[in-house]
UniProtKB/Swiss-Prot annotation:
Signal peptide: none annotated. The keyword Transferase applies. This is Histidinol-phosphate aminotransferase 1. Belongs to the class-II pyridoxal-phosphate-dependent aminotransferase family. Histidinol-phosphate aminotransferase subfamily. Pathway: Amino-acid biosynthesis; L-histidine biosynthesis; L-histidine from 5-phospho-alpha-D-ribose 1-diphosphate: step 7/9. It comes from Caulobacter vibrioides (strain ATCC 19089 / CIP 103742 / CB 15). One of its GO terms (biological process) is L-histidine biosynthetic process.
């Protein structure tokens, strides 16, 4: 029999990628990079095919040195995962005993809770205000059994963000025994001058880890590469239990190439910065409530009127070949999340939703 509670965990459900009767739907359901991947990363991936019979470097030293160089970090304070999801799970394994708890926002990313519950930990959901993490509510949830506080900044699936000042205030209010996990999967898309990526806080504090991913702005979601930066006393136990060959040779090579492809990153960021406000404005004009976003997607809240609901909107768009994400499993039953697409895709989504809303 599995451990108590394992079969009570709701498995992670990703964005839909197929729709019956439509051969090639437009996928705007998983916050992938709509531009694809860096050509330099693709070349690096192809150049690695002659080494498929070789185990990868378990310490990912080539990638480690590249990330350290790019972000001016100490290489010994880095860990690498099969996506940043694996790092979240490893943190839970390192820090949680049965009955311990994690704290996250009420609309927080599902992987945090899955990792905690797999370790027989409890999950405390802090109330959010306007889909935004409220640091006072987070602090209220912390008690003597709290071991980890997970904050995605910007957040998924809402797109909201906290300023550097707010993150520092939250950290200052936490007991030293609680590790603050700052998930920066979408950090590259945030242009707010008051936003901070958390790396400096992780450099100076004893209980902060920042995680990043190559899945979003770098367009390498299929390769599953994430990294974390923290004090060595946090990294060391993760390294003790981390699977030994968890990032493949092609993944490491492609990630290094992507990391230094500034042109691809700039184009990816520019597309989002151009079409995110446009899409938000257009959806607002249809009578939908759009949450301010600093990520590569927008969250739109629909009426509860039969025929105009979020699940019905998701189904309508799918019937026309456009896949978006209803987020009822994130305690947002009236909302859908839409990845920023190419111009023609964004315009098509607005036109279809205009039809759906009867405008």
């Amino acid at each position: 029999m599995p451990k108590p509670g394992i079969m009570d965990i709701h498995a992670y459900v990703g964005g839909k990628s197929k729709v019956e009767g439509i051969a090639h739907p437009v996928k705007l359901s998983s916050n992938e990079n709509i531009l694809g991947s860096s050509d330099k990363a693709k070349d690096a991936y192809r150049n690695a095919v002659d080494r498929l019979h070789i185990y990868p470097d378990g310490k990912a030293n080539f990638l480690r040195a590249a990330v350290a160089e790019r972000y001016k970090l100490e290489p010994e304070r880095l860990t690498f995962g099969d996506g940043s999801d694996e790092i979240f799970a490893l943190l839970c394994q390192v820090y949680l005993e049965p009955g311990d708890n994690i704290v996250q926002g009420e609309h927080g990313f599902a992987a945090y809770a899955i990792g905690a519950r797999a370790c027989q930990g409890e999950v405390r959901m802090a109330k959010e205000v306007n889909h935004r993490v409220d640091i006072d509510e987070v602090i209220k949830c912390v008690d003597e059994r709290t071991r980890l506080v997970f904050i995605a900044n910007p957040a998924n699936p809402t797109g909201t963000w906290l300023t550097g000042e707010e993150i520092r205030a939250l950290h200052a209010a936490l007991p030293p025994s609680v590790v603050l996990v700052l998930d920066g999967a979408y950090a590259e898309f945030c242009s707010d001058p008051h936003f901070e990526d958390g790396l400096e806080l992780a450099r100076t504090a004893e209980n902060v880890i920042v995680t990043r991913t190559f899945s979003k702005i770098h367009g390498l979601a299929a390769l599953r590469v994430g990294w974390g930066y923290a004090p060595e006393h946090i990294i060391a136990p993760i390294e003790r239990i981390r699977p030994p060959f968890n990032t493949s040779i092609p993944a490491q090579e492609a990630a290094v190439a992507a990391l230094f492809d500034d042109d691809f990153q700039d184009r990816s960021r520019a597309l989002v910065e151009q079409w995110r406000p446009w899409l938000a404005q257009q959806l607002g004009g249809l009578g939908l409530e759009v949450t301010p976003s600093a990520a590569n997607f927008v969250l739109a809240t629909f009426p509860t009127t039969p025929g105009k609901t979020a699940p019905e909107a998701e189904a309508f768009l799918a019937s026309k070949g456009y896949l978006v994400r209803a987020v009822g499993n994130y305690n947002l039953p009236h909302a859908i999340r839409i990845t920023i697409g190419l111009e023609e895709q964004n315009r098509a989504v607005v036109e279809l939703l205009s039809q759906f809303m009867g405008r």
